[in-house]
Amino acid sequence: MTQAERRHDRLAVRLSLIISRLVAGETLSVRKLAAEFGVSVRTLRRDFRERLMYLDLEYQSGYCRLRTAGSEMQMVPDVLIFAHRSGLAGLFPGLDRRLVNALLMCDESPCVIAPANPVPSPSGALSFWRLIQAITGRRRVTLIAEGRRCERLAPCRLLIHQQTWYLVAEHEGHIAVFTLDEIHLIQPLQETFRRNDSLCRLVEDPVFIQALPHFRFIQHSLLTFVPADSPPE
């Protein structure tokens, strides 16, 4: 990996962590962030000014946070779009503007969702981000996981099942499944691919989703199965 690529990776991780903290409602100290990420205050200010300019931020005495006063109603459409595109809408019965607004305006959490797994490492967060970009942009990637290297892999969907993220992809004409935890590196390629509609429909099948933890065993068993009446080679 070149120096420019490493610098780009550090930038992507830094921005993803900053955004996640802002969305979580944290008020961030620019100086503390600079020390944490090992960059200058000037670099952090450029991040906020240029790379995060689309966020509605407010600054005061060296601190930064998402603007919230009087903006809850403006956030409702964005929350609904995010919920539907991420697949979270199905968790909330009858999710609409009224429900989103009620959740945004309350001072306590009326809903409880089972705790997720520990926060992924920076490399896991970067892999997740790159896979989102590859799926939406329909670009092939090189994937390096535990014991495997897949060139020109076409990522299809990211699914969460039993608190584990899975990548479902197509590789050399076959379905490939990986957990996010076992992925070490995702290298985006310039080559694009045509979406496989049949695979996209399959990953939405509840039976397929339930089988994700056992997918490789099932696939290996099918590929190595030899009928009893098969002639010897």
Swiss-Prot record:
Q: Which GO terms describe its molecular function?
A: DNA binding; DNA-binding transcription factor activity
Tell me which residues make up the WYL domain: 120-193
**InterPro entries linked:** DeoR_HTH (IPR001034), Tscrpt_reg_HTH_DeoR_CS (IPR018356), WYL_dom (IPR026881)
**Record's protein name:** Uncharacterized HTH-type transcriptional regulator YfjR
Does S-adenosyl-L-methionine appear among the keywords? no
Give the DNA-binding residue ranges.
Answer: 28-47
Q: Which GO terms describe its biological process?
A: regulation of single-species biofilm formation
